[in-house]
């Protein structure tokens, strides 16, 4: 029987979550969904001084917005301390762990001596018990750390799903501290116990964890447990080519929601930021989950490009059904103090403007102009509303006052005014657009007018 896929996302709640972080949630989520497995959320909150519930809430909010639903969790490491200590006791009893009484001053002196000798700084095994070895006298009043007895000789080898075969000599690994003097376990040990207890089959995470992997594999083996499959994702770079981080100006994921990006568009963009399916650039969430596997993860760092993200979002806006788009844009209209709009009218208006927009914020801006109109700039008025066109504007106002208020009837009224005045369409359309929408660039004039209130249109035209 094939083992069920179980993946996890294990963020530290020490600040907001940015796109580089959330991509490390997207891929394990997608792999679990693509294979009928489970996706687990684990909060690695052992850095008590920097962790906060507010940061946890932001992580969950960002995941919820993107639709990255989890099957189990959130589990909190700080709530599992008893379990970690129980496994530590098992390892002590099995001889895999030993107490080390070396002081910080002694470790610093050892490190300085090794660096002076051009050696790699590492713990030298002073307190590691070996057959026939006499250990130093235990100093009084010193609480030891617990170190993992790393295997000597041989190598740790794994086939990384992104980086390929990786081999690290055990001689490169010293005996890792897995519990502090106060008994609290350290990161690498907690991760192994969590992955073991949660039966994680695939660890998909950033490549900043590669150096932790051989140590974690050795702890897995000491516990007699099967080692999960590892896939270490390349770094996400910002637009300046630096590692994406809060320090380097990365935005919270939730800010993209506020800026009017669609969650499916963000999933599409993030998916392509390190994975590919041929030349396909635009795809739905459902297509992504049908196509996703670990074999097509990229090996090189991916660079964020906000212009490309806007383009992807624009494609999803265009493809979205008008009634769905009308529902999505309403919170953004509310932020502009526009509400109570007819659902059918709103869907029609979205259909008219969505091809011109990259975000829901932009779409809401256009829709507000339909409702409230705009004050044109003096420059646009002087350029487009000339003495030559004013009589035509007056004629159009008269025609619109009596015609049926439909796109076809409005188009016929405009055509008649053009015939009567000898003007070309741009000569009439430009000033009307400026007066009503505050810009000479809009969709077709008859479509715009049919969606605006007749009284407002006529009042604006009569002002000149």
UniProtKB/Swiss-Prot annotation:
Motif ('HIGH' region): 11-21
Organism (species): Polaromonas naphthalenivorans (strain CJ2)
InterPro entries: aa-tRNA-synth_I_cd-bd, aa-tRNA-synth_I_codon-bd_sub2, aa-tRNA-synth_I_CS, aa_tRNA-synth_I_cd-bd_sf, Glu-tRNA-ligase_bac/mito, Glu/Gln-tRNA-synth, Glu/Gln-tRNA-synth_Ib_cat-dom, GluQ/Sye
Enzyme nomenclature, EC number: 6.1.1.17
Compartments (UniProt record): Cytoplasm
GO biological process: glutamyl-tRNA aminoacylation
Gene name of the encoded protein: gltX
Family: Belongs to the class-I aminoacyl-tRNA synthetase family. Glutamate--tRNA ligase type 1 subfamily.
Entry protein name: Glutamate--tRNA ligase
Catalytic activity as recorded in UniProt: tRNA(Glu) + L-glutamate + ATP = L-glutamyl-tRNA(Glu) + AMP + diphosphate
The keyword Cytoplasm is annotated on this UniProt entry: yes
SUPFAM superfamilies documented for this protein: An anticodon-binding domain of class I aminoacyl-tRNA synthetases (SSF48163), Nucleotidylyl transferase (SSF52374)
Keywords (A to Z) from UniProt: Aminoacyl-tRNA synthetase, ATP-binding, Cytoplasm, Ligase, Nucleotide-binding, Protein biosynthesis
Quaternary context: Monomer.
Residue ranges of the motif 'KMSKS' region: 243-247
Taxonomic lineage of the native organism: Bacteria, Pseudomonadati, Pseudomonadota, Betaproteobacteria, Burkholderiales
Gene Ontology cellular-component terms listed: cytosol
Pfam families (UniProt xref): Anticodon_2, tRNA-synt_1c
Keyword Nucleotide-binding attributed: yes
Residues noted as binding ATP in the record, renumbered to the chain: 246
Gene Ontology MF annotations: ATP binding; glutamate-tRNA ligase activity; tRNA binding; zinc ion binding
Physiological role: Catalyzes the attachment of glutamate to tRNA(Glu) in a two-step reaction: glutamate is first activated by ATP to form Glu-AMP and then transferred to the acceptor end of tRNA(Glu).
């Amino acid at each position: 029987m094939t083992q069920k896929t179980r993946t996890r996302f294990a963020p530290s709640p020490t600040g907001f979550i940015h796109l580089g972080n959330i991509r490390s949630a997207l891929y394990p989520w997608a792999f679990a969904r693509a294979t009928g497995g489970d996706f687990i959320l684990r909060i690695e909150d052992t850095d008590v001084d920097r962790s906060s519930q507010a940061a946890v809430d932001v992580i969950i909010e960002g995941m919820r917005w993107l639709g990255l639903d989890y099957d189990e969790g959130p589990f909190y490491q700080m709530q599992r301390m008893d379990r970690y200590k129980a496994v530590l006791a098992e390892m002590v009893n099995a001889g895999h762990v030993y107490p080390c009484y070396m002081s910080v001053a002694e470790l610093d002196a050892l490190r300085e001596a090794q660096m002076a000798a051009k050696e790699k700084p590492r713990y030298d095994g002073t307190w590691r018990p070996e057959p026939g070895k006499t250990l130093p006298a235990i100093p009084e009043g010193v609480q030891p750390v617990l170190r993992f007895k790393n295997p000597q000789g041989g190598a740790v080898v794994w086939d990384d799903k992104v980086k390929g075969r990786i081999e690290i000599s055990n001689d490169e690994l010293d005996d890792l501290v897995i519990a502090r003097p106060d008994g609290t376990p350290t990161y690498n040990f907690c991760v192994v116990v969590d992955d073991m207890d949660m039966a994680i089959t695939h660890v998909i995470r950033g490549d900043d964890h590669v150096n932790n992997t051989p140590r974690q594999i050795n702890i897995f083996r000491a516990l007699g447990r099967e080692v999960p499959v590892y896939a270490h994702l390349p770094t996400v770079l910002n637009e300046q080519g630096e590692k994406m981080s809060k320090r380097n100006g990365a935005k919270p994921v939730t800010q993209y929601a506020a800026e009017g990006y669609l969650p499916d568009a963000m999933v599409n963009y993030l998916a392509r930021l390190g994975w590919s399916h041929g030349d396909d650039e635009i795809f739905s969430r459902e297509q992504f989950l049908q196509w996703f596997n670990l074999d097509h993860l990229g090996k090189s760092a991916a660079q964020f490009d906000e212009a490309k993200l806007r383009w992807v979002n624009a494609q999803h806006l265009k493809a979205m059904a008008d009634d769905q788009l009308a529902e999505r844009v309403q919170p953004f209209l509310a932020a502009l103090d526009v509400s109570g709009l007819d659902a059918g009218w709103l869907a029609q208006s979205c259909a008219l403007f969505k091809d011109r927009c990259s975000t829901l914020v932009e779409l809401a801006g256009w829709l507000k102009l339909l409702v409230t109109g705009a004050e044109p700039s003096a420059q646009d008025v002087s350029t487009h509303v000339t003495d030559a066109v004013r009589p035509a504007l007056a004629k159009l106002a008269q025609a619109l006052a009596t015609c049926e208020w439909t796109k076809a009837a409005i188009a016929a009224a405009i055509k008649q005014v053009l015939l009567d005045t000898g003007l070309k369409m741009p000569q009439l359309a430009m000033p009307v657009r400026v007066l009503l929408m505050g810009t000479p660039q809009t969709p077709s004039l008859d479509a715009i007018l049919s969606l605006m209130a007749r009284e407002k249109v006529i009042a604006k035209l009569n002002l000149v």
